[in-house]
Amino acid sequence: MLVSPLPDVGMCAPHPGGEEMSNFKPDGRRTVIPRIITDDVAGLVRFLKTVFGAGGEPQSATPTEMTMGDSVVMISDGSGAREAMPAFLYVYVQNADETYERAIAAGAESIEKPTDMPYGDRRATVKDSWSNIWQIATYRER
């Protein structure tokens, strides 16, 4: 059995020779789920739908879960026990240039125009109206 040296902290990956727990997270979930805390859940949801084609609807009693490709991003209201906190996320999309243009049209500020990176990504960076930073990338072979 795997035992964490820290109290109440589970292991997210098996160690060599250790037992692997198969039910430590719900089926279909990734190990890491980003969570953005904002004072404007509905506005951020609209932005994600417009720019990234994200799926999901604002929720009031639970975090809003937005699907983006094969990933989920949780969005929570920052007016309760948690203060609004921006995030920095790297998102792969079909076309970085078009997604960048949609972000700018939706009110985002350009930080970096689409640029070919030496590691094979075409990448752009924007800052949305809630101070989240989005690096938008499309992989192109080197």
Predicted regions and their residues:
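Short beta->alpha transition motifs characteristic of CBS
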Residues: 35, 77-78, 118, 125, ...
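Conserved active-site tyrosine of GNAT-family acetyltransferases
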Residues: 47-48, 103, 128-131
